[in-house]
């Protein structure tokens, strides 16, 4: 099952956009500030701009600071994981990813994101 299909099944708002590297991802976000993704799935190992550099850039922009980011990577480097969490990621999974755990993680993150973006009135 593809990531796009999983997001569709979970009713994640906005469509899935696939960028080949961090530079393309930053360009997409900058060009689409009025329709930001509900979640970003990111790899550490990407050409031109790696995932850590991408995270640093988006976390320094007020429009992108709170976007939930999940790392899906082959990197088993502990420093990558620590630095990613220090930069505010919502989840980290090493490939190959267990489908059920992935779905569960995305469900929890999207639920939390929706609650934080649209708090219930008391």
Language-model segments: what does each one mean?
Residues 90:
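Short, glycine/charged-rich "phosphate-handling" switch motifs in NTP-dependent
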Residues 4-5, 18-39, 103:
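Acidic, metal-coordinating helix/loop segments flanking the phosphotransfer/catalytic sites
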Residues 42-43, 73:
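Active-site residues of response regulator receiver
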């Amino acid at each position: 099952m593809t990531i796009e299909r999983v997001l569709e099944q979970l009713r994640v708002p906005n469509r899935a956009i696939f960028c080949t590297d961090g530079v393309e991802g930053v360009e997409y976000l900058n060009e689409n500030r009025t329709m930001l993704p509900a979640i970003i799935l990111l790899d550490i190992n990407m050409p031109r701009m790696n995932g850590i550099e991408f995270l640093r850039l988006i976390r320094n922009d007020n429009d992108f600071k709170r976007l939930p980011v999940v790392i899906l990577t082959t990197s088993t480097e502990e420093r990558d994981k620590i630095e990613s969490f220090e930069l505010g990621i919502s989840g980290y999974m090493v490939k190959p990813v267990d489908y059920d755990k992935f779905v569960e993680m995305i469900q929890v993150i999207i639920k939390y994101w929706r609650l934080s973006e649209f708090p219930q009135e008391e």
